Amino acid sequence: SPVLPEGVKNYLIDIDGTICDDIPNEQPERMIDAKLFPDALKTLNKWYEQGHIICFFTSRTEDHRSVTEKWLKKHGFKYHSLLMGKPRGGNYHWVDNHLVRATRYNGKFTDLIEKDAKIEVFDDGKN
């Protein structure tokens, strides 16, 4: 991926349970009618218009791509990409040589604020 200009963020946004009802992959017939969460559309489209990169990163499988794209279009989401196949249920631990930032969704989209947090890191022997 390209180097982003200063100030531009690359947002990876989950779908189920984050921007709409939490629908398991085993119930795809419910996906097209998933209820949109308040402020999700407004906030994400605002970030898009501000020049940030919006990538939906979902645990839905490739079999669900078409219904997911239709749902996003139906609701008017602006985005750059859609990645399928994220590990389910938070069952992942990201390891990277670059800083990774995460924001837990707590039921409402708002502007982001800064907070100090305790994190786990590899022991590099430089305590």
Predicted regions and their residues:
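HAD-like aspartate-dependent phosphatase fold
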Residues: 1-127
